[in-house]
């Protein structure tokens, strides 16, 4: 029985959880538009970092919703263990700075064991091949018998070792997934309060009269209906009416046209996707407090962001260098359970189960990701400045980055009805992590394979 | 134990099934944009046609997915049994014309039984009240003992009869739901081929070059990606790219602005709703071959049309007459499993699991529904004429109406890439069929001259509203029409004039050089 060929896969074990309820209260309302945190996965995954073969098949889906160690994953992350081993001090410091609970020692140990076991397996295979070769020639019956016996023993040992190897690789992947992305050198080290202000635009408007919050305005101007939606659908759903409908369409139309001018390709996406895609993007559709709605009777889920179906377009692909960069502005409805989000930061339109969003997504060469990160944040700042908003752009500190982000800029706008700033967008540079997840590669002119980084921006 | 107060409810036992695979093949591709057909429900429902009280509570949700007769429904339709009984010949003819499998005899029989049982129950209650009254006075001990005994017996009989009554009402509702709406006298009787042409606009464009279908155009112009979507989501999903995104937004923007001019209120809606709302609108979320996606671990579903959440806005309400008519143009994404739809009519954008749609919905007084039906179809015809489409409006024959529709106009547009007409919109007058299930009523502003029974003291009795729905724009089907009809020999596609301002002035979708 040969080693199962498995699709390169991955799941950075992250969940959509609101940063809000994990952080101490400040004057800034962090809405956790799309935060990811690490959580050890209980499902073992197999890593295929050493196989040169690109063609793989899916492991039969035996994933169950309970965390059984025996459950085989559908796919694996192409994690660069050699690099981790060779840079272990930096990786350790990074893990600490990010408050991650990744266990680097365990990873390195398992990796060593795995490498050794792999060598042993290969050695046994070679011996068995030799035996098979010898048996092709003319032999004495006793010699033949001896070889048959030897072949059988080798085969039995191999089967055992190969099973062990599979388990070891699963375990290694399981532990290794917790390891967060490396961090940009300019990112401030520390918690939320250490985040640096990259820019502040405008100032809070001075009102000469008592002001209303958006809920009151929505009622008074007959723009938003939460009450009917609570009957029809449940809490955190709403209807938009009258000018609010036109406003939503205007926002999306205008945003699309502005961003298209910068060379982004407009896109609409499926809002139902296979759950494996959701996982590859780093979310746990079936975990407790999952943010993801699943469809009954299928392996499908609703997307929480267009990032998921857009990332999926190019999965398991090799792109030509000349095709890069790929720049998309993707529009979709987004669905989130908001499980676990409670308290004041759920009022009205702040936290809803369904909303429209335009998302920018960039696939580029590694050396370009930093400049695209700057391009994305610049586009956002320009958009919000044009709309006359008062906002600040934050360079998020290490403990506030999600696992995939190499660097993250959040924009928080002033919301007078609430008397605080609230997050309206973020821009993440995912560097190579998502590239691992979706197995994107770029073939350089020189023919060397390198993983591409991704830059993401939400609007 | 009193009669359980139950919420006005119902579920017409219908499913979203495509008319296509139920009808013989003709030169018209009936895409069954939104058809409903009858199917007996296995779950009994309780009817509340006789209770004057409007305030009710939900029956605890004990619905299970297997059809157990003991399962209590969450709500009931306010079906007018007296009217059915008094007009039974007309109802029977209607059932036959519509090829419905409703069993009128069974309904009438159950109704009789129910009425009689109800009388018996009321009689026993009155007796028990009398006994209780007598016991308030001064009595001989033996007399008191006798009355106590009598009271006990009456109570036991009542409990039994009341349980029977509940079961009977459930059974009655279960059978009665199959009964379709009555039919407009002008509707042709018969199958699909009997549908009458109300109007035909334009003529098929003559092409001087070999034409492509929308799939080919979508590939060549880099507008539609089905392949990636098949990997990411499955078949019948797609990405729109480049000008197609602008085209979708232009279609919706333009449609919205045109319809708003006619006094329709724009609306966006939740796309996740409780399954009971879906049922009240006449769909079976949990039947075999259901068109409805359900959400795991909840009682929620994805909507297949904005008609559902819009109908839900005013459910269990009494509107003022002065508030009517309510006219909405609602925009939403729609999700359909398309279970059971197979064959040639599933190609490309014809039949997809997710699409954008603008839907018109009207709530009005009964006497106005006919004129609103005309208004809706006129709006649709004007929209499609403005876009330069060649289409015909059909007055659908009786066998082709869904259960809720009193009358239905379908518009089928010429799709040259397929060489046939394909349904792009549908306008239905559902009269009071949905409102009896959703519980939408209105209170007339003045008492009528001849005195029918009054509701609350000095207030005129409430009546059920009429509801209508009509597709203003189903984006994928429109895209098929526009791409295929407006293609040029050089592979480009012309944008119809009304849409250009909504697309930043683009006049042409040109092939891109790679």
Swiss-Prot record, chain B:
InterPro entries: aa-tRNA-synt_IIb, aa-tRNA-synth_II, aa-tRNA-synth_II/BPL/LPL, Ser-tRNA-ligase_type_1, Ser-tRNA-synth_1_N, SerRS_1_N_sf, SerRS_core, tRNA-bd_arm. Pathway: Aminoacyl-tRNA biosynthesis; selenocysteinyl-tRNA(Sec) biosynthesis; L-seryl-tRNA(Sec) from L-serine and tRNA(Sec): step 1/1. Pfam families: Seryl_tRNA_N, tRNA-synt_2b. It comes from the Eukaryota. L-serine binds at residues 305-307, 359, 471. Gene3D superfamilies: Bira Bifunctional Protein, Domain 2, Serine-tRNA synthetase, tRNA binding domain. It is an enzyme of class 6 (ligase). PROSITE patterns: AA_TRNA_LIGASE_II (PS50862), UBIQUITIN_2 (PS50053). Its EC number is 6.1.1.11. One of its GO terms (cellular component) is mitochondrion. It is found in: Plastid, Chloroplast; Mitochondrion. Disulfide bonds: none annotated. GO terms for biological process: chloroplast organization; mitochondrion organization; plant ovule development; seryl-tRNA aminoacylation. It catalyses: tRNA(Ser) + L-serine + ATP = L-seryl-tRNA(Ser) + AMP + diphosphate + H(+); tRNA(Sec) + L-serine + ATP = L-seryl-tRNA(Sec) + AMP + diphosphate + H(+). Keywords: Aminoacyl-tRNA synthetase, ATP-binding, Chloroplast, Ligase, Mitochondrion, Nucleotide-binding, Plastid, Protein biosynthesis, Transit peptide. Homodimer. The tRNA molecule binds across the dimer. Consists of two distinct domains, a catalytic core and a N-terminal extension that is involved in tRNA binding. Catalyzes the attachment of serine to tRNA(Ser). Is also able to aminoacylate tRNA(Sec) with serine, to form the misacylated tRNA L-seryl-tRNA(Sec), which will be further converted into selenocysteinyl-tRNA(Sec). This is Serine--tRNA ligase, chloroplastic/mitochondrial.
């Amino acid at each position: 029985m040969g080693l199962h060929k498995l699709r390169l896969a991955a799941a950075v074990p992250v969940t959509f959880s609101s940063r809000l309820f994990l952080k101490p209260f400040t004057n800034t309302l962090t809405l956790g538009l799309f935060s990811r945190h690490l959580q050890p996965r209980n499902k073992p995954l197999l890593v295929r970092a050493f196989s040169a073969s690109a063609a793989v098949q899916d492991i039969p889906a035996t994933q169950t919703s309970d965390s059984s160690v025996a459950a085989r994953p559908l796919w694996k992350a192409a994690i660069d263990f050699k690099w981790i081993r060779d840079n272990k001090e930096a990786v350790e410091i990074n893990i600490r700075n990010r408050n991650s609970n990744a266990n680097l020692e365990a990873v390195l140990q398992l990796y060593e064991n795995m490498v050794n076991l792999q060598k042993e397996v290969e050695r046994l295979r070679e011996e068995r091949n030799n035996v098979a070769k010898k048996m092709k020639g003319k032999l004495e019956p006793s010699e033949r018998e001896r070889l048959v016996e030897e072949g059988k023993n080798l085969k039995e040992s191999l089967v055992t070792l190969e099973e062990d190897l599979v388990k070891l690789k699963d375990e290694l992947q399981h532990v290794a997934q917790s390891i967060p992305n490396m961090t940009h050198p300019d990112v401030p080290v520390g918690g939320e309060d250490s985040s640096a202000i990259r820019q502040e635009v405008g100032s809070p408007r001075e009102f000469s009269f008592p002001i209303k919050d958006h809920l009151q305005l929505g009622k008074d101007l007959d723009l938003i209906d939460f009450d009917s939606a609570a009957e029809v659908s449940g809490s955190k759903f709403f209807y938009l009416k009258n000018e609010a409908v036109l406003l939503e369409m205007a926002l999306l139309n205008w945003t699309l046209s502005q961003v298209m001018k910068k060379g982004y390709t407009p896109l609409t996406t499926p809002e139902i996707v296979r759950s494996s895609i959701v996982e590859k993007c780093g979310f746990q559709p079936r975990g407790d407090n999952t943010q993801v709605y699943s469809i009954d009777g299928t392996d499908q889920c609703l997307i929480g962001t267009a990032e998921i179906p857009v990332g999926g377009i190019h999965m398991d692909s090799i792109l030509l260098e000349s095709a890069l960069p790929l720049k998309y502005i993707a529009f979709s409805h987004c669905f989130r359970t908001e499980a676990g989000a409670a308290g004041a930061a759920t009022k009205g339109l702040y936290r809803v189960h369904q909303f429209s969003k335009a998302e920018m997504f960039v696939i580029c060469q590694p050396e370009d990701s930093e400049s695209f990160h700057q391009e994305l944040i610049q586009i956002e700042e320009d958009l919000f400045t044009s709309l006359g908003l008062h906002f600040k752009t934050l360079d998020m500190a290490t403990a506030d980055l999600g696992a995939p982000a190499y660097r993250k800029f959040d924009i928080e706008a002033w919301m007078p009805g609430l008397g605080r700033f609230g997050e309206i967008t973020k821009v993440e540079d995912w560097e190579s992590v998502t590239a691992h997840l979706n197995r994107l590669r770029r073939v350089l002119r020189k023919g060397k394979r390198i993983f591409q980084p991704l830059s993401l921006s939400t609007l």
